[in-house]
Swiss-Prot record:
It is found in: Cytoplasm. The keyword NAD applies. Its EC number is 1.1.1.290. Disulfide bonds: none annotated. The gene is pdxB. HAMAP family: PdxB. GO terms for cellular component: cytosol. GO terms for molecular function: 4-phosphoerythronate dehydrogenase activity; NAD binding; protein dimerization activity. One of its GO terms (biological process) is pyridoxine biosynthetic process. The active site is at 202, 231, 248 (proton donor). InterPro entries: D-isomer_2_OHA_DH_cat_dom, D-isomer_DH_CS, D-isomer_DH_NAD-bd, Erythronate-4-P_DHase, Erythronate-4-P_DHase_dimer, NAD(P)-bd_dom_sf, PdxB_dimer_sf. This is Erythronate-4-phosphate dehydrogenase.
Amino acid sequence: MKIVADENIPLVNEFFGHLGEITRLPGRSMTAEDVRAADVLIVRSVTPVNAALLEGSRVRFVGTCTIGVDHLDQAWLEQQGIAWSSAPGCNANSVVEYVYAALCHLDIHWLHGRFGIIGCGNVGGLLYRRLKAQGVDVRCYDPNLTLAQNPDLTSLEDVLACDFISMHTPLVTTGSYPSFHLVGERELAQLRPGAILINAGRGAVVDNQALLDCLRVRHDVRVVLDVWEPEPDISLELLNEVAIGSPHIAGYSYDGKLNGTAMIYQACCKHIGVAPQADLSELVPPLDDNLLDTAGLTQPWPLAKHLIKQVYDIAADDARLREQAQLACAGNSEFGAGFDHLRKHYPRRREFHNYQVRLSAQAEAARHWLTVLGFRCV
């Protein structure tokens, strides 16, 4: 069996090696010729999987190591009898930790205001549960849910009136609830003074031109963008206006990536009728030094902020993206290639649950907060 896989998917050989011959290729430039002789195709969100890529190929199974599936032409795949699978929830924890890291970098105490979430699926739902467990006043907009599923559901207008807004919707262009440009000029005008807007879902859910126009006059609004419209050739003007910008890496924790690979491996084995041999728990490398320094802090908010910054310095992601923009503006590089380079060579970021915190007796009040965030308190 021949397997073609995106070169940026970790542990592909370790998981899929016993199933067949593996060819690893750049996902964004994958062509029909590249996959013509493949039986299995393993991709990420940068590879559009449709008739143009697969018509005339031998591919019978497509796996995407991502939560989102807007890059798959699902109707065409099903029409052709090509099985496909995604990895829902694989990097939800990673994205939620990105949101917390962004708030810490902006020095935003999330208890001091109302928090709005747009899209309460795997990612938004996890963020919702963590915030509620910390005592945050949360409002959610998701037309696909009922009040029985989430008692804090409300209108989009009510969510847009919150102090902090985090967006986690898939990109949907058809059906009853399309999300393309869900937040545009009219919605941005509803943001309250001093609002924080985070988009770590899909770039085109926010009208990026309307957002740029808004930020040019609304200097009180601070925006965090991990996803852009379009990618990889994002608006450098918009990058200059946002408080934090990153190259679509919110879900790029090493743990999240490995979860995605493992989920697609399991689905592939099931599809071809082979018993799985690889086990994620045996492949994940342990951290050598996972005890964090509390710096003598004892109160929940200052201690949480200090620990999060130790584990994940989101400012470094922002700085690397802006450095690529400066190189492009100086004519020393092509920005789109630089954007992809940052994603391909992203540092190994481990999630909070890999780290231990030794609490003093004076810091016991912070135990619940830190446990909700995922840290292991000892």
